[in-house]
């Protein structure tokens, strides 16, 4: 079954991003148009829409565009195996755990500050 081809505006609407975001993703090699019209307009297939949604979800989960690029490259590469993807995911999880410890320490410090000011004295 052949994918439906979409203009950049339609893909932006379907994926919930701006056309500028799509152009940026293309510049960063996260996506690429499936083809171009005779006039040079970008045309994207349904896979591009899925890919953009994956990128946005991964960003929402805290992955950087660099992390996402690495995951997408692993997915595209025939030689990539589950172990490669697993290694990237483990490294990301470790970074998140480190950030979480820092945030917990900051939260504890803020709690101490709040408690020290509970009497209303300035």
Swiss-Prot record:
Residues 5-74 form the HTH merR-type domain. GO terms for biological process: response to mercury ion. It comes from the Bacteria. InterPro entries: DNA-bd_dom_put_sf, MerR-type_HTH_dom, MerR_fam. Residues 8-27 bind DNA. Keywords: Activator, DNA-binding, Mercuric resistance, Mercury, Metal-binding, Plasmid, Repressor, Transcription, Transcription regulation. PROSITE patterns: HTH_MERR_1, HTH_MERR_2. SMART domains: HTH_MERR (SM00422). GO terms for molecular function: DNA binding; DNA-binding transcription factor activity; metal ion binding. It holds the Pfam family MerR_1. Hg(2+) binds at residues 81, 117. Mediates the mercuric-dependent induction of mercury resistance operon. In the absence of mercury MerR represses transcription by binding tightly to the mer operator region; when mercury is present the dimeric complex binds a single ion and becomes a potent transcriptional activator, while remaining bound to the mer site. This is Mercuric resistance operon regulatory protein. The lineage of its organism: Bacteria, Pseudomonadati, Pseudomonadota, Acidithiobacillia, Acidithiobacillales.
């Amino acid at each position: 079954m052949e994918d439906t081809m979409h203009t950049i505006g339609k893909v932006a609407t379907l994926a919930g991003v701006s056309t500028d975001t799509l152009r940026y993703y293309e510049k960063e090699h996260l996506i690429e148009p499936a083809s171009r019209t005779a006039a040079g307009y970008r045309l994207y297939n349904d896979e591009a829409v899925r890919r953009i949604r994956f990128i946005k979800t991964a960003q929402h989960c805290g992955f950087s565009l660099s992390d996402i690029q690495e995951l997408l490259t692993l997915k595209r590469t025939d030689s990539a195996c589950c172990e490669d993807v697993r290694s990237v995911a483990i490294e990301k999880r470790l970074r998140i755990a480190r950030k979480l410890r820092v945030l917990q320490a900051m939260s504890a410090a803020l709690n101490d500050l709040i408690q020290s000011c509970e009497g209303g004295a300035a």
